[in-house]
Amino acid sequence: MPRSLKKGPFIDLHLIKKVEAAIASNDRRPIKTWSRRSMILPEMVGLTLAVHNGRQHVPVLVNEEMVGHKLGEFAATRTYRGHAADKKAKKR
C-alpha cells in the first residue's frame, strides 16, 4: 500500500543535507548513504548516490524515471547464482 499523500515523501534528514550541500558546491562525487528507505526526490536528478547493499556501496546515477522510487530498489542485496545443474543431463 503506498504512502499517504498528506504525509509526503520520506527522506532521512542527513541525506537531504548531503544532497543540498552537493548541489550548492556543484560537487559530483558520489554521496555515500545507508538510507535505502529514502525516496528519490526531483532535486537528486543528476547526482550519483552510493547506496549500501549490506556489503558494499553501489553507485546509482539518478535520472528522471527514478523519482518517487526508494533508493534500495536500485541496489540489489541478494546475488542469484543459478540452480545446481543436473548431473544426469550433463552426461548425455
UniProtKB/Swiss-Prot annotation:
Which stretches are annotated as coiled coil? none
SUPFAM superfamilies this protein is in? Ribosomal protein S19 (SSF54570)
Give the GO terms filed under biological process for this record.
ribosomal small subunit assembly; translation
Q: Which GO terms describe its cellular component?
A: cytoplasm; small ribosomal subunit
Pfam families attached to this UniProt entry? Ribosomal_S19
Q: Where are the transmembrane segments?
A: none
Keywords attached to this entry: Ribonucleoprotein, Ribosomal protein, RNA-binding, rRNA-binding
Q: Which GO terms describe its molecular function?
A: rRNA binding; structural constituent of ribosome
Keyword Repeat attributed: no
Function, in words:
Protein S19 forms a complex with S13 that binds strongly to the 16S ribosomal RNA.
Q: Which NCBIfam families match?
A: rpsS_bact
Q: Return the PANTHER family for the record.
A: RIBOSOMAL PROTEIN S19P FAMILY MEMBER (PTHR11880), SMALL RIBOSOMAL SUBUNIT PROTEIN US19M (PTHR11880:SF8)
- Please give the family membership noted in the entry: Belongs to the universal ribosomal protein uS19 family.
Q: What is this protein called?
A: Small ribosomal subunit protein uS19
